[in-house]
């Protein structure tokens, strides 16, 4: 049996997982499953040793190509998360300005300091 075959299958399943439409509701599940598959693949990669057969090298090249596609899709997800975090921070700042509109004003108006003794 080809030693690279399990790595190829896991990588292919990762690609399939990322091809499914990722929404806000299922994003956390997809990321969790991806992490699990990455850990599985890493365990298999650690046990993999040289020399490689011609078949294994060809399959390895396919895995590298798939991995580049997976990485691009994961970067898109990461960018979406960053945009959402920025929007959440803006909303939080905007909502706080309504609850305490004078929070940013640091003045001592209305205080009387008596210097006499």
Swiss-Prot record:
Disulfide bonds: none annotated. GO terms for cellular component: cytosol. The keyword Cytoplasm applies. It is found in: Cytoplasm, Cytosol. Keywords: Bacterial flagellum biogenesis, Chaperone, Cytoplasm. Its main location: cytoplasm. One of its GO terms (biological process) is bacterial-type flagellum organization. Belongs to the bacillales FliT family. May act as an export chaperone for the filament capping protein FliD. This is Flagellar protein FliT. It comes from Oceanobacillus iheyensis (strain DSM 14371 / CIP 107618 / JCM 11309 / KCTC 3954 / HTE831).
